[in-house]
Amino acid sequence: MEESNPQFANALRRIMMSEIPILAIEYVDFSMNNSVLYNELIAHRLGLVPLVFDNKKFHFKDKHDKGKTCSMCEVVFAINKKGSGIVYTKDMKSSNPDVKPLYDNIPIVELFDNQKLKLEASASLGIGKDHARCQAAIASYRYFPTVKLSGKLANVDEVVKICPKHAIKIDGNKVDVDMNCDLCKECVRKADPEGSLEIVGDSTRFIFNVESISGLKPEEIVFQAVDILKKKVKDFGKEVKKIK
């Protein structure tokens, strides 16, 4: 991201982590469970299973009267399995063919002989600000590295070699640093003469790292975060006009 500032970058980061709507299991109704794990622990595991879904086809439950739901705000998963064997996410049967666990091989619980797990779990939209099961991603950012060279380095090879990220390249009086640079400044400390090389972070350019921990792709999370931030700015502008 370029031509911006830390305040804007941090607002975007916070939205990615806490305000992107995610479909996650909220309630679990157990009909039978005599496994080694008690109901609450299995329910907790199910709540953290990432689900693939189309966010355009779902809305929040609060659009309905309390206690009422529809196929666009709730998806029901059923598990009915007998031991012995391991219950995986592939054993979760969905009421909506377009909604399923992101991975089929996530273990839920191991069943031994004469043990059975039968349940229904309902998934609905939520955001990370309200519950950890609905967090879309882990997002962070850092400044884009910029380099300044004053004078000629006496130990070019040593400076290039000491970089742990292999991110610096020097060709005569030209120095290039790629995005892998984490501003550790090992090259700066090694530079001879002292002070001839300087690497700083550009506070108007940012490198984002977005790791999805949900059924959404990182690019989907970024685009949704931008849309949400735009809406917040627009709503804020309306409130300011009311003051006038």
Where do the protein language model's features map onto the residues?
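Protein-protein interaction/assembly regions in multi-subunit complexes
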Residues: 1-244
